[in-house]
């Protein structure tokens, strides 16, 4: 992609936008940064853009496809691209191989981050410079996707891809790609379920070595079957059940490959590791969280699809620990007859993730902190499906009505406490106090809200940290000593 002497409008100066602006300027591009909230922006309104002299637009994920400036650029025939698309087209040759580093792309409604981290850890153990990048990126601009793609030292990029990023991305041809699952999320942004799925499916287009898909998800399986991949690209389904030919799964307590990705023939059973090797991913009673097992299968199929050493990868995987705010016990209070456990799953920002979290616990054991920014989602199916697990619910957030209506229609016998949304600073303290009124020995106070956090918190991490602090305080005040 030739960007010297071109004019690029960067819409949104967050980490990805600011980083891309720097990369482009280093290549002689005239960059116009537009952000109404950033004093350092070149312009603070899209009304001030001289569209007659713009060659490309990079759109931040905060802007949906129906945003006026996006429509105006498209009307004029100006390409609107994501940072992912720019990074893909700007990538440089690896200094050792002389060709661009392979990209492994992971998307899905849930499981993206853990899978991306597992993939990176295994490849790093195999001696490769394989950073995580993309939607997973922290505030470190040196590890943004555009920086990683233009760094000749990286051997492989492990890229978490959101549906927002993929919408304005069209030329990807990943070496390996995975879709972990698809459930209703961000439907307001995409304008519907089919649009959302279509954007997710872009990771499979023209994939070169392997695509990995959830064989227990009908929509993902359909996308994999329809995917137009490069000749010789392997399609690997993962399942938590015994695998069929073409799949990797669980059989008699073992991870078993029958896809051929582990070196055997398609249909031949190859035992890879005992599930008991992954007790570090288990809850305190030793039972494994099913969604983390799914992440293990996905990541393993991806690295084997790339050709990584099997034994080295497995050794790294068996010592992997997921990041914070993912079904993490943050406090435990001794009470009469036992204890109450507080579990932070703030990363569960949609119904699909919350279902996976809730389903990990025994019947009528969960006091559930739910709610937040619903993003157009409904929760009737979730509440109906998990009513047997939920002992009580405490609803937070500014957008409480969808969750309130779900309990009223699907589980009217479950007690519900609604937290006044007015004071953001104390909302989590009040929520945990409310949970304490229901808690008894053996119960789990689970914060897996099924909603985004930005209505009352800085991020899902901020929400999780506040929950952990409130849980520890409650345990100190109310727990037996």
From Swiss-Prot:
Catalytic activity: UDP-N-acetyl-alpha-D-muramoyl-L-alanine + D-glutamate + ATP = UDP-N-acetyl-alpha-D-muramoyl-L-alanyl-D-glutamate + ADP + phosphate + H(+)
GO BP field: cell division; cell wall organization; peptidoglycan biosynthetic process; regulation of cell shape
InterPro entries to which the protein is assigned, alphabetical: Mur-like_cat_sf, Mur_ligase_C, Mur_ligase_C_dom_sf, Mur_ligase_cen, MurD
EC number: 6.3.2.9
UniProt key word Ligase: yes
Pfam families assigned to the protein according to its UniProt record, in alphabetical order: Mur_ligase_C, Mur_ligase_M
Pathway assigned to this chain's UniProt record: Cell wall biogenesis; peptidoglycan biosynthesis
Localization per record: Cytoplasm
Binding of ATP, residues: 108-114
NCBIfam families xrefs: murD
Entry's Gene Ontology cellular component terms: cytoplasm
Molecular function terms from GO: ATP binding; UDP-N-acetylmuramoylalanine-D-glutamate ligase activity
Function: Cell wall formation. Catalyzes the addition of glutamate to the nucleotide precursor UDP-N-acetylmuramoyl-L-alanine (UMA).
Family per record: Belongs to the MurCDEF family.
Name recorded for this polypeptide: UDP-N-acetylmuramoylalanine--D-glutamate ligase
Keyword Cytoplasm: yes
Keywords: ATP-binding, Cell cycle, Cell division, Cell shape, Cell wall biogenesis/degradation, Cytoplasm, Ligase, Nucleotide-binding, Peptidoglycan synthesis
């Amino acid at each position: 992609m030739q960007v010297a002497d071109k004019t690029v409008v960067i819409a949104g100066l967050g980490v990805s936008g600011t980083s891309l602006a720097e990369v482009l300027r280093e290549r002689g591009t005239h960059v116009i940064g537009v952000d109404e909230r950033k004093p350092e922006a070149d312009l603070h309104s899209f009304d001030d853009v001289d569209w007659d002299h713009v060659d490309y637009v990079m759109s931040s994920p905060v802007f949906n496809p129906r945003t006026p400036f996006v429509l105006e650029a498209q009307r004029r025939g100006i390409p609107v691209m994501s940072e992912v698309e720019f990074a893909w087209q700007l990538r440089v040759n690896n200094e050792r191989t002389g060709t661009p580093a392979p990209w492994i792309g992971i998307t899905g409604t849930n499981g993206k981050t853990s899978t991306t981290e597992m993939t990176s850890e295994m490849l790093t153990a195999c001696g490769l410079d394989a950073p995580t990048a993309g939607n997973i990126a922290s505030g470190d601009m040196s590890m943004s996707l555009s920086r990683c793609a233009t760094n000749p030292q990286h051997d492989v990029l492990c890229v978490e891809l959101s549906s927002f990023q993929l919408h304005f991305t069209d030329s990807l041809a990943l070496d390996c790609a995975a879709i972990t699952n698809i459930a209703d999320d961000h439907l307001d942004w995409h304008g519907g379920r089919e649009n959302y799925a279509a954007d997710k499916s872009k990771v499979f287009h023209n994939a070169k070595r392997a695509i990995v898909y959830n064989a227990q998800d009908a929509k993902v399986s359909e996308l994999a079957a329809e995917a137009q991949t490069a000749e010789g690209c392997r399609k690997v389904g993962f399942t938590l059940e015994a695998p069929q030919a073409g799949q990797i799964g669980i059989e008699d307590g073992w991870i078993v490959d029958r896809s051929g990705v582990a070196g055997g023939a398609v249909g031949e059973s190859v035992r890879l590791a005992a599930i008991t090797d992954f007790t570090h991913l288990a809850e305190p009673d030793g039972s494994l969280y099913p969604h983390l097992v799914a992440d293990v299968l996905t990541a393993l199929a991806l690295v084997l699809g790339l050709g990584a050493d099997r034994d080295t990868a497995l050794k790294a995987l068996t010592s992997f620990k997921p990041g914070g705010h993912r079904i993490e016990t943050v406090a435990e209070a001794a009470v009469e007859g036992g204890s109450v456990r507080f579990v932070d799953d703030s990363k569960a920002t949609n119904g699909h993730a919350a279902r996976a979290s809730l389903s990990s616990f025994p019947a009528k054991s969960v006091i559930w902190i739910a709610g937040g920014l619903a993003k157009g989602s409904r929760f009737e199916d979730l509440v109906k499906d998990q009513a047997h697990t939920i002992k009580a619910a405490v609803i937070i957030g500014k957008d409480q009505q969808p969750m309130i209506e779900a309990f009223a229609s699907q589980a009217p016998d479950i007690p519900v406490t609604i937290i006044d949304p007015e004071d953001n600073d104390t909302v989590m303290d009040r929520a945990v106090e409310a949970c304490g009124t229901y808690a008894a020995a053996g119960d789990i106070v689970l914060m897996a809200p099924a909603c985004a956090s930005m209505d009352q918190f800085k991020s899902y991490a901020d929400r999780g940290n506040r929950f952990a602090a409130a849980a520890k305080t409650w345990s100190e005040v109310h727990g037996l000593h």
